[in-house]
From Swiss-Prot:
Keyword RNA-binding in annotation: yes
Coiled coil ranges: none
One Pfam short name: Helicase_C
Motif, Q motif: chain positions: 9-37
Family: Belongs to the DEAD box helicase family. RhlB subfamily.
Gene: rhlB
Lineage of producing organism: Bacteria, Pseudomonadati, Pseudomonadota, Gammaproteobacteria, Enterobacterales
One GO cellular component, as annotated: cytosol
Low complexity: bias regions: 402-414
Primary subcellular site in the record, as a coarse category: cytoplasm
Subunit record text: Component of the RNA degradosome, which is a multiprotein complex involved in RNA processing and mRNA degradation.
Its job: DEAD-box RNA helicase involved in RNA degradation. Has RNA-dependent ATPase activity and unwinds double-stranded RNA.
Name of the molecule in the record: ATP-dependent RNA helicase RhlB
InterPro entries reported in the protein's UniProt record: DEAD/DEAH_box_helicase_dom, DEAD_box_RNA_helicase, Helicase_ATP-bd, Helicase_C-like, P-loop_NTPase, RNA-helicase_DEAD-box_CS, RNA_helicase_ATP-dep_RhlB, RNA_helicase_DEAD_Q_motif
Cysteine-cysteine disulfides: none
């Protein structure tokens, strides 16, 4: 974490359980981020918190620290059964649930509290086997949680801590009925520590907090601008015919260490993947059609640096906690203004700088005025020389279901192609 992203407040300054502090410091966490410095005094005092902060600002560690401290400091109910978790953390996507679980593992190892993971797509029996042995903290997506609850594999009657992460995304994906179903099976709000975190605290999110929390305190960490002041934004106006060639030329020029390319449809993502894979880039594809095991493998390879480029739809734009993403390319300008912010928020995280490059083609340029109005500024425009675009490109690969989602990146230096402007 960059020091510029941290406050002077130290975790050790709080009356946190010693095992929690030890686990944090072992992972190199000494100073709090702004959202952690605001939320922890409240949760340690037993107050409910509804927090707003940009992605990448430490929200996850804020609620994990609070959850582990609370469970270590408050005994479980006397007649708690093996199928009754003590804490429930709900996430909108399986990728986010998996990442929260990974972030929680060092704390679990240090404290002895047991973790469980529940998400749809695959792994039903494997997840169930862990639950049957008893877990303290259950992390999951609402659909799989309801499946387990309806079959009495889990019982929510002993819940002491509830976390709702990416609450605005829960609404976007239509999970609000599922959330309310789960809340109705828990002890009353006054008998739990409740935490809600969201990129935006809209009216509907505040309404949910009013319904399901106990006089929650609202804490907000507002960025200087919605897109983050450490992100360099850049805009090009390519023709439809030059768009793919421009993208590949920019990639050769920028030679990003770790980049995510967003497009508006899965078919467009597959097309981009095919061009880049054929050109020798180490590229992965992440869309709703990719099988769950493969999705997790691709994310792991991208996080480890085995892949340099990830091509993704907006289904993957929220909740990806991947460090050191240097570049985000908006191959298509999104139809939803918030998606622009969420997309480019994958870079420039935790105090680092980042570069966002958007292509306003003939098909999606009409989305630009609304995006610029939403973010409160114009995106700087750059020009390019059409004659300098790459044109000796191999025929794109066509995706087959048996083909892996990456290809070897070509060895050697990037091509020496420069744009004008």
């Amino acid at each position: 974490m960059s020091k510029t992203h941290l406050t002077e407040q130290k975790f050790s300054d709080f009356a946190l359980h010693p095992q929690v502090v030890e686990a944090l410091e072992k992972k190199g966490f000494y100073n709090c981020t702004p959202i952690q410095a605001l939320a922890l005094p409240l949760t340690l005092a037993g107050r409910d918190v509804a927090g707003q902060a940009q992605t990448g600002t430490g929200k996850t560690m804020a609620f994990l620290t609070s959850t582990f401290h609370y469970l270590l400091s408050h005994p479980a109910i006397d007649d708690r059964k093996v199928n009754q978790p003590r804490a429930l953390i709900m996430a909108p996507t399986r990728e986010l649930a998996v990442q929260i679980h990974a972030d929680a593992e060092p704390l679990a190892q240090a404290t002895g509290l047991k973790l469980g993971l529940a998400y749809g797509g695959d792994g039903y029996d494997k997840q169930l086997k862990v639950l049957e042995s008893g877990v303290d903290i259950l992390i999951g997506t609402t659909g799989r949680l309801i499946d387990y609850a309806k079959q009495n594999h889990i019982n929510l009657g002993a819940i002491q801590v509830v976390v709702l992460d990416e609450a605005d995304r829960m609404y976007d994906l239509g999970f609000i009925k599922d959330i309310r179903w789960l809340f109705r099976r828990m002890p009353p709000a006054a008998q739990r520590l409740n935490m809600l975190f969201s990129a935006t605290l809209s009216y509907r999110v505040r309404e949910l907090a009013f319904e399901q929390m106990n006089n929650a305190e609202y804490v907000e960490v507002e960025p200087e601008q919605k897109t983050g002041h450490r992100i360099k934004e850049e805009l090009f106006y390519p023709s439809n015919e030059e768009k793919m060639r421009l993208l590949q030329t920019l990639i050769e020029e920028e030679w990003p260490d770790r980049a995510i390319i967003f497009a508006n449809t899965k078919h467009r993502c597959e097309d981009i993947w095919g061009h880049l894979a054929a050109d020798g880039h180490r590229v992965g594809l992440l869309t709703g059609d990719v099988a769950q095991k493969k999705r997790l493998r691709i994310l792991d390879e991208f996080t480890r640096g085995d892949l340099d480029i990830l091509v993704a739809t907006d289904v993957a734009a929220r909740g990806l906690h991947i460090p050191a993403v240097t570049h985000v390319f908006n191959y298509d300008l999104p139809d939803d203004c918030e998606d622009y912010v969420h997309r480019i928020g994958r870079t420039g995280r935790a105090g680092a700088s980042g570069h966002s490059i958007s292509l306003a083609c003939e098909e999606y340029a009409l989305n630009l005025p609304a995006i610029e109005s939403y973010i409160g500024h114009s995106i700087p425009v750059s020009k390019y020389n059409p004659e300098a675009l790459m044109n000796d490109l191999p025929k794109p690969l066509r995706l087959t279901r048996s083909r892996p989602g990456n290809g070897p990146r070509r060895a050697g230096a990037p091509r020496n192609r420069r744009r004008s402007g």
